[in-house]
Design a protein with these regions (language model features):
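Glycine-rich, aromatic-flanked loop segments that form ligand/cofactor-binding clefts
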Residues: 91-126, 173
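Flexible C-terminal active-site loop/helix
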Residues: 1-18, 25-27, 31-33, 41, ...
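A cross-domain feature marking catalytic cores of carbohydrate-active enzymes
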Residues: 49, 121-123, 149-151, 174, ...
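Metal-dependent enolase-superfamily TIM-barrel catalytic cores that perform enediolate-based chemistry
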Residues: 116-233
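Conserved, mostly hydrophobic/aromatic
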Residues: 3, 90, 103, 147, ...
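Metal- or metallocofactor-binding catalytic centers and their adjacent structured scaffolds
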Residues: 5, 38-102
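Shared catalytic-loop signature of beta/alpha-barrel
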Residues: 65, 69-72, 210, 219-238, ...
Length: 375
C-alpha cells in the first residue's frame, strides 16, 4: 500500500456573538479549520490543526511511500517544521489512515491502555467573579472533576478573586486548574509576560485556594525559571503545550521544569513523539496530559493519545458556554463530541480516530486559505 494523494482544505464559520479568548486581546469573530486528507487505496485518513503553511509543493516527499513508515514521515515533518509551519496534522491523518487499514482505533494502535478518558472542563473566556462562580457550579453539577480558569486581567488580584469566588461556590471537592497563558502570545499582542516574582506571588495565592496546577506562568523558554518556580511553589506547575522542538520538551525534563507536561500532538510533538515523551514524563513521576484547544479532530487526536498513554487524572475538554460550545468547536464533524457520562468520554472501537468527515456538508464553509485573522 502506498500514499496516493494528500489534500489540504480550509474552512471557516462566523462566531456571533464573538468568542473572547482570554489569551487573545482581539475578540474572535470567526473560527478557521484546516483538514489534511490522506488517501491510499480505498482508505482515507484525516487530521487537523495548524494551517500547514509551507507544506504545498512537498507532497511528493510522502506520496508513493508506505503510510505505515511513520518513523520516516515524522523525520520529514520535523524537517518541514524547521523551515515552515507546524505540519503535524499530516501525521495525525496518517495514524487515522493506519487505523482504518488495520481496523483498529488509534488508541489501541498506541497501546490500548483504556478507552475511557476522564475530562476537565476547560474554560476559555475571562468572566466576572460571580459569573465564573455560577459557571463552576454548573460544571460541577455535570460531573466534571475539575475546571480550568483563565487569567489575563491587567490586575492579577482580580484574577485571584475570580478563583476565590469559584472555590467558594464549588467547595473543596472539585479541582481548580489555572492557566496564566504567559508562555506565548498571539502575533498582534505586544504585552510582556509575567516576571518570576509575579509568578511566585500568584502561585502562593492560588495554593492557598487549593488550586491543583498553575499553567504557563512564565515564558515557554524560561526552563530554569520554571524549574525554580516549581521548586518553590506549593502547587503543581504545568506547561509545554507549544514548544515546537522535541528537544525543547526533553530540556524541560532535564531541568525539572514541570509537574504536568502538556505538549499538544498537533502543535509540537505529533503522535509518535507523544508516545515517546509520555513514557519519559511518567517515568519521572510527573503527569502527562496534552493541551488541546481547537476543533473536534484536534480533540480526538489528543484524547486517543491520552487513552493509550496517559495516567493523568483528567484530560482537557474545551467547554465554556455560551460562547464556546461543542457545536461551534466541532463544526467540521458530523456531530459534536460530548461526554459519555459525568466527567468522562468513552472512545469508540471504530477504526482510526473514529469519525468520517461529511465533505459535502462542509463545502458551504470552505475558504481558500486557512491563516489566522487579526480581527
Amino acid at each position: 500500500m502506498k500514499i496516493e494523494t494528500i489534500e489540504i482544505r480550509h474552512y471557516r464559520i462566523a462566531l456571533d456573538p464573538p468568542f473572547h479568548a482570554a489569551w487573545d486581546p482581539n475578540p474572535r469573530r470567526t473560527f478557521t479549520n484546516t483538514i489534511v486528507c490522506v488517501r491510499a487505496g480505498d482508505y482515507e485518513g484525516v487530521g487537523s490543526g495548524d494551517a500547514m503553511l509551507g507544506f504545498a509543493g512537498h507532497e511528493h516527499l510522502f506520496i508513493g511511500h508506505d503510510p505505515f513508515a511513520i518513523e520516516r514521515h515524522v523525520r520529514l515533518l520535523d524537517n518541514l517544521q524547521f523551515h515552515y509551519g507546524r505540519c503535524w496534522p499530516l501525521e495525525v491523518a496518517l495514524w487515522d489512515l493506519m487505523g482504518q487499514v488495520a481496523g483498529q482505533p488509534v488508541w489501541k494502535l498506541l497501546g490500548g491502555r483504556t478507552s475511557r478518558v476522564p475530562l476537565y472542563a476547560s474554560c476559555g473566556e475571562r468572566k466576572p467573579a460571580a459569573a465564573r462562580a455560577d459557571s463552576a457550579k454548573q460544571l460541577k453539577a455535570l460531573g466534571y472533576p475539575a475546571l480550568k480558569i483563565r487569567f489575563h486581567d491587567a490586575d492579577i488580584r482580580q484574577d485571584i478573586a475570580v478563583v476565590a469566588a469559584a472555590r467558594e461556590a464549588i467547595g473543596p471537592d472539585m479541582h481548580i486548574l489555572v492557566d496564566a497563558n504567559q508562555g506565548w502570545q498571539m502575533p498582534w499582542d505586544a504585552s510582556a509576560p509575567w516576571d518570576f516574582k509575579t509568578a511566585l506571588w500568584a502561585a502562593d495565592a492560588l495554593a492557598d485556594l487549593g488550586v491543583f496546577w498553575l499553567e504557563e506562568p512564565l515564558h515557554r523558554h524560561d526552563y530554569e525559571g520554571l524549574a525554580e518556580l516549581r521548586r518553590r511553589a506549593k502547587l503543581r506547575i504545568a506547561g509545554g503545550e507549544g514548544n515546537r522542538e522535541y528537544a525543547d520538551l526533553r530540556r524541560y525534563l532535564k531541568h525539572g521544569s514541570f509537574d504536568v507536561y502538556q505538549p499538544d500532538v498537533v502543535w509540537c510533538t505529533g503522535v509518535l513523539r507523544a508516545r515517546q515523551l509520555a513514557g519519559e514524563v511518567q517515568a519521572a513521576s510527573c503527569i502527562y496530559t496534552p493541551h488541546t484547544w481547537g476543533d473536534g479532530l484536534v480533540l480526538l487526536a489528543n484524547l486517543h493519545v491520552c487513552a493509550a498513554l496517559s495516567t493523568a487524572p483528567f484530560a482537557e475538554f474545551p467547554y465554556d458556554p455560551p460562547n464556546w460550545t461543542p457545536e461551534r468547536r466541532d463544526f467540521i464533524l458530523p456531530a459534536p463530541l460530548l461526554p459519555s457520562g459525568p466527567g468522562y468520554i468513552d472512545l469508540p472501537d471504530a477504526p482510526g480516530l473514529g469519525v468520517t468527515i461529511d465533505w459535502d456538508k462542509l463545502e458551504a464553509f470552505r475558504i481558500e486559505a486557512g491563516t489566522m485573522k487579526s480581527n
